[in-house]
Structures are given as C-alpha cells and as structure tokens.
C-alpha cells in the first residue's frame, strides 16, 4: 500500500512533469488573474500596497544571520519570507527584473547562512517556506547554479535538520542533539509549531523533490501529514471551532496550515483530507464570537488586543465555500490593512451577508463564553474565560473577563509579555493578579495554581439574558470559588458574581483592569468609569468597597521586575502597564463570601435596582 508521502510525490509529478513551476499556492494562471485584476475593486489597494512594499525592499541590504535575544532567528526568518514573497509577486505583476534581481540577493544571503537555526525550529521552518516559495515562483529566472545551491541548502538546513525531530522519539529525547529546544514533534497534543514546522518542510519538499536524489522526501511528507492531521482534529474544537491556543495563535497556526493545504492542492491536486474537519470550518465563527462589535478579540493568554479578521478568513471562505467571510476581510483591505497572504487567497466576489450570529457563545464543558446585547456596532459585549491555566500559551487567568460598550473596552486583558522574561510565569501579565479575577492573600507565592483547569458548568441564553457559571476551586487549593457572569439585555448590564469558601484569615482580592477614567463614590460602593464620554456604572451589591490603583495597575505588585539571575544579570523589563488602572475589592474575616458586582451602561434610562441570587438559583 502506498504511503501518503508517496501518493503526494506521484500526484505532483503527474500534474507538473518536467520540473514544471510555479506549483506552490500560486500558479501561472493565478499570477495572470491578478495582473488582470490589479486595477479593480478591492484588488487595487491590496496589490498596489504589495508592490509599494516591494519597492521599499529594493534598497535594503539582505538580512543577516542574527539572534538578538540569544534564542531566536525568527525575526530574520520572517523578514526573509516577507521580502521574498513581495518581490516575487511584484516581478510577476510588473515584469520588471529589478524585483527578481533583488530577490536573488536575498536568496543568496539566506542559503549562505551557517544554518537555519534548528535549535529553535520555527526559525528553520519559516526559512524553508520562504526559500521554497522563492525557488518555485522564480524558477525560470534563477540560474542553474543558484537553484543547485538552494536545493543543497534545503537538504542540509531543512531536511536533515527535521529528521532530528522526527527520529528522536520521546524515550530518547535530546540524545541526538542535546542543544535542541522545544521538541515540537514529540509533544502531544502540541501547539502551533506543528502547523508551522510540518507546513514549512512540506513546502520545501514540494518545491525541489523532483530534482534531487534524496530518500528523505517521502519520509518527511509521511511524518508531516500524520502529525498535522492529528493536530488539526485536536486544536480546532469539533463542536464550536474553539482554537485551543486562543484568538492570537489561531492566525499563526492557520496561516501555515493554509500554506500546507493550499500547497498540496496546487502541487498534487488535493490535500488528501488534511483539512476536512468541521472544527476548522467553524473556527472563524469562534473568532467572531470571541470579539467585540469592532472585531477586537478577547486576547486571553499569550495574545495582544487586535482585530481578529485576518487574511485567513479568505482562505477559510474558499476552502469551506463560505463567501460571507470574504466580505469581512474586504473591509480591512479597503482600509489599506492588507497582508501578503491576502494576495494568495482573497477574491473580490459579490458580497454575501454573514449568517445571523447568535447573541451568546458557549456551552457546558466549554472554555469560554461571550454575550452581547445585540448585533449592533454599539452593543454591550462581555466575555469570560475558564480553561486550563497550563494550556499551550495559557496564563494563570481562570475566570478573567472583558467588557465592551461598542468599540470601547472598559475591562481589558493585558495580554502577552516578553517571552524572554525569567521566569515568564512570574511576570505580572501572566499571573492571576494581572487579570480580572480573584486571588487569595496576594503575594509572590500565592496566585492561581498552574496545573488547575475548569470548564463551564452551566450555560444558558434566552432573549433577555444569558449566563455562564464555572467552579474555579481547582485554582485555589483548600478553598472553594465559583464564578458566574450574567448579561441582562434590557438593562444593558453585566453581573460578575463569586461565591467563596475560605479560611477566616484569608484576604480576598477581586480585581479588574481598565483604561477608563474612574471616579469612586465616597462610600466606595459605586464607581463611574468614563471612556471619552461613554460611561459605565459599577456597583457592589454585596460586602466590600471599591479601591483603585490609578494609572499603573501593577504598582503594588511584588513581581513587576523579576529578580536578576546569575545566568541573566540584566533581564528584559516587563511591558509597561502605564495608563491601566486596577479597580479592586478586598474582603476578609469570614469563611464564606459572596461578591456580586454589576456593571451597567449609563444612558438616559434610570438604572434599576438589582437582586442578588445564589448562583445555584440562576436559571
């Protein structure tokens, strides 16, 4: 029986005999189509921007082999990928040799690197993708000597290097090369590295396999396909499309999955079922559900606060016959926010309205829940995150929440920090104290348990309101903590309620981070948050009073600057949280606490009184 790798190689040879190129995502017909479309509709700003970026590259020196943080060549790898893809497209679009000639300079520099830094294999994989695209798209322009040099570099720096990963089984970890870092192939279920590394190496194989004497090609394709096939089915939840690493890493992982799948399609005529997965098809709607009315995502874990409407929406539109996703991406393109990946996938087709999105997202046993008052641009939107703290790219953030009124985010997730911090898990943004949740006895030692996890226990939504409840006790040893979020649509309010069992001497701190201007009433029971005239009314419905750390949320944190270590006497500073205030409530002296805090959008309507019910009676 033929292996999947053998099938891919045979199909590619049949479709592209006599070393025919281009065959990686872009074909001759695709480049011709873009030349014809260059002045039309949304194609014009997208393609004009791509050529303008290529023009900027012409006078730049080629990238050097530099590892500025001592860990990653990744900045160079990504720059090479960006440069080569832009230059290649500009050459096809204009026919001007200056773009191809400048690409040759970049290729020559890259193939002469001492290696492609397999110790941090993402660096190697992204360079494999970059050089594969350039070799394929410029095949008829490159000299025979340079093509031979490219093939040799890919074999040495890519194929031989990846076999160290594929051959090094867990029981022999680091035997072959003890200097390797993260063992992404052995890691199960793993993370975005599987898409990037397997995808980059597959592109490299497809670019050169028919011109080399190398018995590794089939082996690499076999390992890459099997590993990625499994990862797709674990990373993209079958029920609702939730991506396991959150909204930020969805784009990175799916970008390389799209390269992998589309490269197989144009080379071999099929991706052999790699992306035939309903969870992947549903994943753009996970992003839409996890974003505010202006498409800014809920950036829990290692993510930044940014728009979720990436170029991969266009790939999903084509792959899963969902043209409504093109329209979402088109808005960004018309605003001048295109990316080179748009060139690969975007189609300016007649707009199809997005299917009606539910006003709530979640279910029992899910990691996240979101609610909104309506589908309008000025709607109130709130989201809450549970999940496993030690998930890939997770933080100690169980129970954290965000809240928007329209485009204004009143309660924020501070997002990721510098991965080179030592220890990263000790930085403010990683710890529970840097999130919108509760902690007991604030100190460097006391936070949420790293190994803890939970999912939604109860989820409900109807016309007027919706709620999600989860038991977070696993995060707090020897304590019990249950948190609920309820959004009430008629009153435009969000209730965060915690029910806690603890020790009498425990100090509980409830916190939420905000960029708003905050005014606390004299009695401390209410506060008004103001963002450029849009106001949110906060009220404590139970014990406690509001306090605030103004303008610098982490000011009283004992871990804002990690202590230097002998191996790193000058650690990188943590990111600046200037301009973010921490609104908090401190409670102590009892074994049982109920903390109910309601946030209501301030309008001309009178704010109705609230009733506090035990979470067990929410229905």
Task: Tell where the protein language model's regions lie, with residue ranges.
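Low-complexity, Ser/Thr/Pro/Gly-enriched N-terminal "stalk/linker" regions
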Residues: 2-68
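Solvent-exposed loop and edge beta-strand segments that line ligand/cofactor-binding
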Residues: 23, 63-80, 112-125, 167-196, ...
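Active-site lining segments of carbohydrate-active enzymes
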Residues: 64-71, 132-246, 344-356
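CBM-like, beta-strand-rich accessory domains located in the C-terminal region of large
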Residues: 417-619
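Terminal accessory carbohydrate-recognition/targeting modules of carbohydrate-active enzymes
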Residues: 2-18, 22-23, 31-33, 363, ...
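Well-ordered alpha-helical scaffold segments within catalytic/enzyme domains
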Residues: 21-40, 81-97, 109-117, 127-146, ...
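Carbohydrate-active enzyme catalytic cores, enriched for enzymes
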Residues: 182, 208, 248-411, 461-464, ...
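Long, repeat-rich segments with strong aromatic
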Residues: 221, 225-268, 369, 373-375, ...
